[in-house]
UniProtKB/Swiss-Prot annotation:
One of its GO terms (biological process) is photosynthetic electron transport in photosystem II. InterPro entries: Photo_II_D1/D2_sf, Photo_RC_L, Photo_RC_L/M, Photo_RC_L/M_CS. The keyword NAD does not apply. This is Reaction center protein L chain. Keywords: Bacteriochlorophyll, Chlorophyll, Chromophore, Electron transport, Iron, Magnesium, Membrane, Metal-binding, Photosynthesis, Reaction center, Transmembrane, Transmembrane helix, Transport. It is found in: Cellular chromatophore membrane. The chain crosses the membrane at residues 33-56, 90-118, 121-146, 176-205, 231-257. It comes from Allochromatium vinosum (strain ATCC 17899 / DSM 180 / NBRC 103801 / NCIMB 10441 / D). Pfam families: Photo_RC.
């Protein structure tokens, strides 16, 4: 892939966290770095272990290469927080380590790229929230509940079954107040950024013979429709806040389900019915 005209001046030494100049190079447009190598290693090992797990299966009947049916299940609850045999959940434990290694390596690679460019660490900071949500699901919550078996299985359909089953364990998971906040932030984020994206497209794609519109048109549109324009920079701050809030409350909603609340979530709202106001 050809290098863009402005890229060469940014391909400078330094900014690395580990390894010095050893891995300080690019492969095509991709910066490698120590964490690029580490991330590739963990990702490749994890994928190969999933393929191996699909090959051996927990039993002969469940050996499959159907991508929809492949499932690497966590250990049985009886193993607690100990290591399980490879075919009884140990594979899931090792793949989890690989996933964590790959995700963290990717984030640290982003840090190195930011250091090279002299820009802020907003991108790795945002990605860290996604990593944190994953850690809550496969590390924090299982530890709080006393068994790795409370983690979710690695499989397309099997992990959807896990989500459904956990929801039914708490009757109506949508009554979880943190889940409500997470969904609210998800939808609000979609609304805000879709409105922003459509506005930019509308002013930068004029009809034939017309000029490209300016930020004055953008601000005027939103002042006309909702009475306020947040501005070009602030809409991105708002989008980041909404996205990170959605991820944060998603992690909260699952980590409190089980370790801190064991009954159906509709019961949590009894305090509302017992208010003296009624």
């Amino acid at each position: 892939m050809a290098m863009l005209s402005f890229e060469r001046k940014y391909r400078v030494r330094g900014g690395t966290l580990i390894g010095g100049d050893l891995f300080d190079f690019w492969v095509g447009p991709f910066y490698v770095g120590f964490f690029g190598v580490a991330g590739f290693f963990f990702a490749l090992l994890g994928v190969l272990l999933i393929v191996w797990g699909a090959t051996i299966g927990p039993n002969a009947e469940l050996q499959t290469y159907n991508i929809w049916q492949i499932s690497i299940a966590p250990p049985d609850l009886s193993y607690g927080l100990g290591m399980a045999p490879m075919t009884e959940g140990g594979l899931w434990q090792i793949i989890t380590i690989c996933a964590i290694g790959a995700f963290v390596s990717w984030a640290l690679r982003e840090v190195e790229i930011c250091r090279k460019l002299g820009i802020g660490f907003h991108i790795p900071f945002a990605f860290a929230f996604a990593i944190g949500a994953y850690l809550v699901l496969v590390v924090v919550r299982p530890i709080l509940m006393g068994a790795w078996g409370h983690g979710f299985p690695y499989g397309i359909l099997s992990h959807l079954d896990w989500v459904s089953n956990v929801g039914y364990q708490f009757l109506h998971f949508h009554y979880n107040p943190a889940h409500m906040l997470a969904i609210t932030f998800f939808f609000t984020n979609c609304l805000a950024l879709s409105m922003h994206g459509s506005l930019i497209l509308s002013v930068t794609n004029p009809q034939k013979g017309e000029e490209v519109k300016t930020s004055e048109h953008e601000n005027t549109f939103f002042r006309d429709i909702v009475g306020y324009s947040i501005g070009a920079l602030a809409i991105h701050r708002l989008g980041l806040f909404l996205a990170l809030s959605a991820v944060f409350w998603s992690a909260v909603c699952i980590v409190i389900s089980g370790p801190f609340w064991t009954r159906g979530w509709p019961e949590w709202w009894n305090w509302w019915l017992e208010l003296p106001l009624w």
